């Protein structure tokens, strides 16, 4: 745990008692603060009381008693409308912050010899894979590495800092909205496409949240920016003009005079005086597809930015084992391979997986995002069959009509069985791809549970029907 500094003897209100909120409360107490915890779910309050934490009804308490409000990232700060705790905090002149901000202030207050290296990663898609990949590269190079934030452990639950440590942090737009003091040694902005627009008041607000990750960088720091979409390209241009830090653009599709890029699966380093071919990513263990080439370019650049030798970074790329639910092969029956890409919760993420196969049997659906799958129409000729589930099934069927064969399946078990039957009937090598292009909350707790349901359905195909039931 990282004890939070700066609130010794003061009381911090904490709203939202999930993983982030409880971890922050413990870290605040460890640093000498007092806490007042609240959650609208009675079971969450009861769990906090059982742990011996101080639960206070923030709807009726005196907010002038609080030095700050620690808001969990899932709670709206501004849109669709500010949460009631935000209103009470602002009315009382109480600052609102998140766990990443608490971490940042603690780092900033530490003596120079105790300050760790920080690599911060954001973007619409690929954050978790890139974060895990950078963590793997750092560990393989012998660095004392802690990976967390929006992936795995909450940042304040990670092991306490020292001067030789490296913190590799995935940051969501929600977390960045609540952060103002973080100063990463290396920042990775992978890509931007429309997502979470209801929480940011539109595309401009979403881009502004992502851009906050660069707020405090200066001389000696490195900004690593994907330039394969227009929004990130614009940010790269503007930040380069500011001329305050090292800028390394990254791309998975175009050669550049400076930065790191991949062409046809070959990774090139153009951060020095000449362009050097570094690795054949087609031979990497778990980095299939163009989107993963961008992730690899980002990870290589981030490792180099904190002083890891190029050959060690390349070794890490080649040995990376991959992450569950991100283009994860979960089984093969005969000629049919099953790929779990449950993390694809929007169309742009699904595009990355769909672009990796010339033909596939596609399981899609759930809670749709704005625009549905309209932007994927250019990939429909690759769809040998679509098997639709969840709330989006009917609308997706209409979008696919006349463009690709589609079937209403309702649930994931039915979809897997139908896709497998059609794939076998083709007599060819085939891929059944779960890449839903939707959130999961209509049928599952989260994308992980959806991915595990897919895995279970695939495993069930190899068993007699009576046992599957």
Curated annotation (Swiss-Prot):
ATP binds at residues 123-129. It is found in: Cytoplasm. It comes from the Bacteria. Keywords: ATP-binding, Cell cycle, Cell division, Cell shape, Cell wall biogenesis/degradation, Cytoplasm, Ligase, Nucleotide-binding, Peptidoglycan synthesis. InterPro entries: Mur-like_cat_sf, Mur_ligase_C, Mur_ligase_C_dom_sf, Mur_ligase_cen, MurD. Its EC number is 6.3.2.9. GO terms for cellular component: cytoplasm. Its main location: cytoplasm. Cell wall formation. Catalyzes the addition of glutamate to the nucleotide precursor UDP-N-acetylmuramoyl-L-alanine (UMA). This is UDP-N-acetylmuramoylalanine--D-glutamate ligase. The lineage of its organism: Bacteria, Pseudomonadati, Pseudomonadota, Alphaproteobacteria, Caulobacterales. The gene is murD.
């Amino acid at each position: 745990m990282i004890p939070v500094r700066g609130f010794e003897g003061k009381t911090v209100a904490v709203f939202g008692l999930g993983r982030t909120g409880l971890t922050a409360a413990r870290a605040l107490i460890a640093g000498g603060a007092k806490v007042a915890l609240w959650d609208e779910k009675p079971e969450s309050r009861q769990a906090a009381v059982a742990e011996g934490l101080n639960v206070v009804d923030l709807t009726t308490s005196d907010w002038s008693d609080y030095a700050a409000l620690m808001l969990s990232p899932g709670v709206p700060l501004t849109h669709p409308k500010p949460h009631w705790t935000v209103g009470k905090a602002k009315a009382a002149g109480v600052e609102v912050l998140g766990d990443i901000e608490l971490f940042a202030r603690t780092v900033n207050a530490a003596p120079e010899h105790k300050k760790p290296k920080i690599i911060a990663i954001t973007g619409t898609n690929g954050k978790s894979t890139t974060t895990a990949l950078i963590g793997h590269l750092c560990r393989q190079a012998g660095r004392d590495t802690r990976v967390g934030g929006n992936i795995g452990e909450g940042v304040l639950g990670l092991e306490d800092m020292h001067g030789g440590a490296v913190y590799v942090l995935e940051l969501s737009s929600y977390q960045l909205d609540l952060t103002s003091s973080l100063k990463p040694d290396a920042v990775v902005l992978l890509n931007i496409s429309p997502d979470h627009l209801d929480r940011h008041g539109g595309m401009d607000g979403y881009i502004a949240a992502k851009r906050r990750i660069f707020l405090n960088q200066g001389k000696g720091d490195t900004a690593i920016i994907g330039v394969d979409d227009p929004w990130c390209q614009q940010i790269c241009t503007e930040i380069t003009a500011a001329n305050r830090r090292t800028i390394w653009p990254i791309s998975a599709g175009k050669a550049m005079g400076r930065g790191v890029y991949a062409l046809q699966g070959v990774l090139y380093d153009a951060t020095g005086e000449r362009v050097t071919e570094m690795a054949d990513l087609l031979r990497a263990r778990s980095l299939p597809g163009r989107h993963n080439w961008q992730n690899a370019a980002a990870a290589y650049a981030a490792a180099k930015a904190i002083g890891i030798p190029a050959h060690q970074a390349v070794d890490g790329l080649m040995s990376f084992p991959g992450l569950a639910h991100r283009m994860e092969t979960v089984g093969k029956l005969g000629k049919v391979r099953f790929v779990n890409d449950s993390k694809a919760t929007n169309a742009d993420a699904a595009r990355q997986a769909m672009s990796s196969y010339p033909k596939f049997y596609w399981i899609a659906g759930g809670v749709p995002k704005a625009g549905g799958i309209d932007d994927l129409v250019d990939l429909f000729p690759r769809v040998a069959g679509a098997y639709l589930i969840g709330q989006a099934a009917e609308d997706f069927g209409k979008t696919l009509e006349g463009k690709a064969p589609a079937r209403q399946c309702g649930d994931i078990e039915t979809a897997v069985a139908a896709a497998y039957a059609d794939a076998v009937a083709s007599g060819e090598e085939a891929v059944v791809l779960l890449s839903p292009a939707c959130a999961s909350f209509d049928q599952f707790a989260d994308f992980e549970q959806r991915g595990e349901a897919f895995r279970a359905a695939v495993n069930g195909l190899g068993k007699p029907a009576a046992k599957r039931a």
